[in-house]
Amino acid sequence: MRPLRHGLSRATSPKGRGKSTAGSFLITPNTLATSLTAWLPLRGKTSPALGEDVTVGDKRGNLARERLRGFYTMNFLLTLAYDGTNYCGFQVQPNGRSVAATFQDALEAVLGSRPDIKGCSRTDAGVHALGFRLNFHADTRIPPQKLPLALNQHLPPDIRVLAAQTVPEDFHARYAAHTKTYLYRIHNHPIDSPFDAAYYTRVPRRLDEAAMQAAAQQFVGTHDFLALCAAGSSAAAHGDTVRTITDCHVTRRGDEVDIEVTADGYLYNMVRILAGTLCEVGAGRLRAADIPAILASRDRSRAGPTLPAKGLFLKCVDYPEKEEQP
């Protein structure tokens, strides 16, 4: 283990007891516990137990929390993929199986503790994820590159940790996000596939993807998206309905039509309503030219239907590069 270097105003020298030093000296695991009572500002405590949290001041005046047994509190950022079919959503719910609670069970099995986790999004029941990001603080010697394998051994097959890294102490997976990208999958065929019907919405009528693409471009930019917001949204209640979509496009591969949206944030059911509106355009019931008027109306009834959750995937979350630097 690398020794810790701290600046102390008064300290016991590790090379000679009774000598007082100023500035900095090295603290090794062997001397840390035995010399602790001589120099740690324990706020009234005289002899902390091994493994107890203590506060140590460094020479810049910052406070660093460390465990006596040599553990360090680190902020971990993980990337997850999950099948949302059997979950009530990501967020912990009082009556229902959530992705967050299931993940915390695995954390407790691996770390011996149950840290709070901060998810990048509150995906709804039945929504899937290809690149969900979450972070948590934990005291552990397990290096981040070994966390995926360790956690996956305790997770059900429909949740997988894909990657892990450390990030700055104040990093928050939700608030630090720059953009989030969602994918909505449509099976454009009269007959369902027996293999992956849980991962798309079937639209039997042939869709005009070129018209849908033209309409998708009307959503790009900064707009008030209240017309694409489901009832019960707290953002709508507070008048916070302006968002910026940086990319929105429609592609077809055979019978599969994909709608991909990237934005700085979303309203409740916004992507599912946007996808439903584009399907109305693809079916000829709306035109691309109607989209600006629908947005300007701020009227939910003028937009398309809310498509089912099962076709929606959180594809990826992007952060400013400096935010992900440990």
Which positions does each model-derived feature cover?
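Structured-RNA-binding interfaces characteristic of tRNA pseudouridine synthases
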Residues: 70-326
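Glycine-biased, low-complexity coil/linker segments
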Residues: 1, 16-18, 38, 43-46, ...
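Flexible loop/turn and low-complexity linker elements, especially glycine-anchored beta turns
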Residues: 13-14, 64
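N-terminal, intrinsically disordered charge-dense segments
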Residues: 23-39, 43, 61, 65-68
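Generic short amphipathic/hydrophobic targeting helices enriched at N-termini
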Residues: 23, 50-52, 70
